């Protein structure tokens, strides 16, 4: 009630044409309004906003695609935090990374990579985000995606090697204790290098991976060799 005792009129929120509350917030670049939808129990969109976070529009774009196209970095991070699927693709195989790459939105690309978006996702033309960036001459994006791929390749090699070593069905009887220690220590060393080297270049990651493979691959090759059958005891004569 107002001081005069009259009921205060409720302000009616009008969304932009052909939008949901989510895409409305993206187009208006109003991150606070989006947060309010999720966190304010009295908000009129509180019960429906989660269903809209990945809903594609008539143009086939998800909210994250729209944010990526417009270069909305903070909005993209908020969408991801609220459940936007960074792996989501449209019927032609385009994901948010393709849109960010096409429009040269480097900040959004970084946010998507941090959220572990798939660098290898291809559209119907066989293009990853990197190739899309290259086609539109977005050099900074190409360089960043090369850097990100080199880093991910190194980390993935470390991870798969560690998983292989932890699988007794694969390594039992094939690797010596020394072999296992070499793998464990070398993987740990490279993982720690990634963690502490904040200014690593694309070439640095490639060089580190090659050095790791040089040590690890000869040992892992033993896993492809046939196991020697234990010799059976000789039978006694009758």
Predicted feature descriptions by range:
Residues 2-25, 91, 147-238:
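Acidic, negatively charged sequence tracts
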Residues 15, 56-57, 90, 123:
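Ankyrin repeat boundary/linker residues
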